[in-house]
Amino acid sequence: TAPITALRLEVLPDDRLPERGPGRCYYEGRKGDFFLSEFSVASKDRKWAIVNPTHSYGKISVGGGGANASNVIDGDGSSGWSTSGQTGKAHHLVLPLKEPIPANTKFSVQMLFERHFVVSLGRFRISVTSDLKSPVAKKHGAEVEAVLAHKPSSASKEQMNFLRRHYLESDPRWKKQRQPIDALR
């Protein structure tokens, strides 16, 4: 194994969550929303500094301020990251580390959801990389990246259909045609 240079937090939709998530908010605030105040990484003997985090999308529905990715490392529980207005859609936060976590080091992740009502995540995935280049969040998610990393000739029919669907769901030129379908979700 290799040292860990960054983490990615993916917030994922799920039909079992309010408004398909990715958050669990259901009685106050926008249904399906979440609000991540702080994200930290620690091992037995130290806390690992996160530098220059980025996100694929950010917007806060309640209160003032922006939804900058850097809010999750500022030590202020009243600031944070959310994807308000994008319920039922996947987004991600990329968190590069100032120094790599050595290979085979056990570590833990702590996420603080600090609002005056319940706004935790309902479905998420955390992945890591050992890439030495400082990774940044992209508009597409991990599944799209995995398919795009292969040669087009080696992609299966299902993978190509997945890419087509992703394109049609995300390209702004198709927004008008998507609206009736999006309204049904």
What are these regions (language model features)?
Residues 1, 12-17, 38-103, 150:
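Disordered, acidic Ser/Thr/Pro-rich linker "stalks" and the adjacent N-terminal cap
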Residues 3-41, 105-115, 126:
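A short beta-strand element within beta-rich, extracytoplasmic domains
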Residues 10-11, 22-24, 63-70, 122-124, ...:
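Surface-exposed beta-strand edges and their flanking turn/coil or helix-capping segments
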Residues 15-16, 28-29, 46-57, 98-100, ...:
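Substrate/cofactor-recognition hotspot
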Residues 21, 77, 108, 159, ...:
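Generic, low-specificity signal for short hydrophobic/alpha-helical stretches with a mild N-terminal bias
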Residues 25, 63, 67, 79-81, ...:
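Residue-level detector of functional hotspots within protein domains
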Residues 30-35, 75, 87-89, 118-120:
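A short, structural micro-pattern
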